[in-house]
Amino acid sequence: DKLICLSIGMGLSVNETNSVLKIAGLSPLYPKIKRDSIIIINMNNNRSVVEINEALYNEGEDTLN
């Protein structure tokens, strides 16, 4: 979650974020996972971490830490 937050703060795209996650040895964002899908959609719409957390919370998903 920390790397996703940093990526959003840096204005990285979803593809760039997935590259960062892979380099760190973590799973990339996967659109068939509900939480990841919410993050991807909001990143594509240039939403902030706060806005993404609100969307995650509203859908009953864990927020970004």
Provide a role label for each language-model segment:
Residues 9-12, 44:
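Histidine kinase transmitter module recognition
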Residues 1-10:
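Short, basic-rich loop-to-helix N-cap that marks the start of a DNA-contacting helix
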Residues 16-49, 53, 57-65:
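Short amphipathic recognition helices of helix-turn-helix/homeodomain-type DNA-binding modules
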